[in-house]
């Protein structure tokens, strides 16, 4: 049987070969007919001046007269790329191209990679703010913590388009979706559930705030990391007030029983553990799981290797186990979230996205599983109906929250999203059939 290390090595070799062959995963093509050079006179100068004049009178006309309505900027500084760490903007580009490809294939969204060479959070905010006119929304990606919290917060406050950090919000959203169905299976209520968030990086900090918005009891939520259980008396609490105020606020609001000491103490009597910690089996010990309540729910989300293998977790008493991997049941995958969420905010021409809309998104995703069981708590990526349904739920939520520039019924938004996604897939199929996209070479 092939080892995980060998499988990863083989995939890396194939990725390098294919990347050299295709030289990029996305491209830009005209979407208008060009029958002769005379057509340039209205697609470009002099006719285009009338279009610019119209937008100058009302900048929202850019959504009607240009591609802004369907354009997303994927912005990164390359400081926390996958499991690679700080590799810089150039080395982040293949990852951002892959993200853009998924945006387009699953959501019909035109996403543009925008790696930027910046060194501090204030410069990042300035550069992103300056680029706002080109895009209908932003997806922030692979930014180190705690810089990512500052950048997201500042851009959400200052910009007039939705700003999303997928490492935070996408992970939190699909985690909540999985927990909704897991709690149904074990017959527990969210307001009664005791939750441990193991790891206090971008994903779990955002998950804590989303669980609060969803109605979980923050006093029954405990955060633990490499320094032990987070509480107001921990030795680093004063410094957190200045270096990571988002984590500091959680230290004050969570852990009603004031558990302290080693992380293992947080597991005792817990109903749920969501781990986004070190990618190393054994990071979570089997005996920690055995101290949890009956019908325990364990999400071990580190990639490429979970913090505890699913079999070990189940043998130790867990009833439901989820990971970030596709070769185990219950993959908690951001790709179930961001294509549909962005399709929705773009269709509504939204000005912002918030935790309430994320709760709506999580409920829409969980609702795709009509009869959840221990091995099926979230949909799979080949559930094609997921994305337009999620988009319509998000778009209509933007309308009800007063964030939308465009107001339609939920059914109309479903029709809009379905048409865009289906049209995009037909265009992609036509490129394949015509040979415009070359067949995949032998691996």
Descriptions of predicted regions:
Residues 166, 186, 296-408, 431, ...:
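Adenosine-phosphate binding glycine-rich loop
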Residues 1-163, 397, 424-442:
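N-terminal ligand-binding/catalytic initiation module
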Residues 62-68, 104-105, 130-132, 156-157, ...:
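Solvent-exposed alpha-helices and their adjacent loops that cap or buttress functional pockets
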